[in-house]
């Protein structure tokens, strides 16, 4: 089965997630067996030491010893988890993938030892959470991506009982984590207390769960294609959604579009509670209001019949940046991008010898735009450009000393007189925000 899996998925380079437990140990020896049979692929192992168990160091030593004995390259990586005990599994998982992401090579695929029983447990946990088709479809047997890591789970159709039988038959040593018997963890509770009763009543329960998951994955794939078509009708940029017609669309379709739009921006599916809140408090709030919903470090805001996904940043209107050398890029604060000199930028006159280029994000002075005869406040000009209010004080304003020159990428003031025989200066603002506002 494993041989066919590797051939069918055309995997050439494998990074094995090797905990030393029975499943990853079984997978390691199966990969070794295939290598000895001259199957064309390379593999190495990674062991993540979570430092949560008194025997963590012994487990690392065991994995290292096994790999050395079989000439398997191995990386031992320690991670530190200091956080809420109620979320320890979730946090450990995230940190584990972050550590792997830093180590995995571009053409490598991560292989894990998840088996048929794990798949059933995952489905039941999704039921407990009230998940939809995405959660209930559980783990994918085929190649997919998590945290930007390509991952395969070749043992998902092999039961834990079959793995144990093979391990005992070949007298192979593995690590038994005593915490696996602690039923305060939901997965252990299901495995030890619930699933045995279900199997006693229905012996093929786990295999039927696996079949249901396969069906759900097929349906999810078709549904995903249809949702993508719907979403693309309203997507302006990944961070901007046109909601002008949402009042005339079925509420359930709107909710699905919203969920998948948020997933594009935060990589995880939002809860139905959050989607409902966005639908009621943002989309259908008063026309003249500026509603927002906060999701972690981000905000969802509405302006001019559009939803915006934007990062929260501190107030920066009092910041002044001096730019003495335009040959070098100037990095703006809070990941607002860079200002560079290039051939594609906004054309500006060179500053005079006694003038210093400085960048600000606010001015109370009225300004005069090129080809305009009336001085206006920036606030008024930004309104004319239909810029969302929260973006207006993120736009770099170029000053020569205290004289306003331009709002970079938008407009230039015509109040600055160019010195004779001076070449123009061309400046560009390189930023994802710039793509949004112009």
Curated annotation (Swiss-Prot):
Protein name (record): tRNA(Ile)-lysidine synthase
CDD domains assigned: TilS_N
Entry keywords, A to Z: ATP-binding, Cytoplasm, Ligase, Nucleotide-binding, tRNA processing
Protein family: Belongs to the tRNA(Ile)-lysidine synthase family.
PANTHER family: TRNA(ILE)-LYSIDINE SYNTHASE-RELATED
Annotated GO MF terms: ATP binding; tRNA(Ile)-lysidine synthase activity
Catalytic activity, EC: 6.3.4.19
GO BP, sorted A to Z: tRNA modification
Free-text comment on this protein's domains from its UniProt entry: The N-terminal region contains the highly conserved SGGXDS motif, predicted to be a P-loop motif involved in ATP binding.
HAMAP family, alphabetized: tRNA_Ile_lys_synt
Family matches, as NCBIfam families: lysidine_TilS_C (TIGR02433), lysidine_TilS_N (TIGR02432)
UniProt source species: Buchnera aphidicola subsp. Baizongia pistaciae (strain Bp)
Lineage summary: Bacteria, Pseudomonadati, Pseudomonadota, Gammaproteobacteria, Enterobacterales
Localization per Swiss-Prot or TrEMBL: Cytoplasm
Pfam families: ATP_bind_3, TilS, TilS_C
Catalytic reaction list: cytidine(34) in tRNA(Ile2) + L-lysine + ATP = lysidine(34) in tRNA(Ile2) + AMP + diphosphate + H(+)
Protein role: Ligates lysine onto the cytidine present at position 34 of the AUA codon-specific tRNA(Ile) that contains the anticodon CAU, in an ATP-dependent manner. Cytidine is converted to lysidine, thus changing the amino acid specificity of the tRNA from methionine to isoleucine.
Binding site for ATP: 19-24
One cellular component (GO) term of this entry: cytoplasm
EC primary class: ligase
Main location as per UniProt: cytoplasm
GN (gene name): tilS
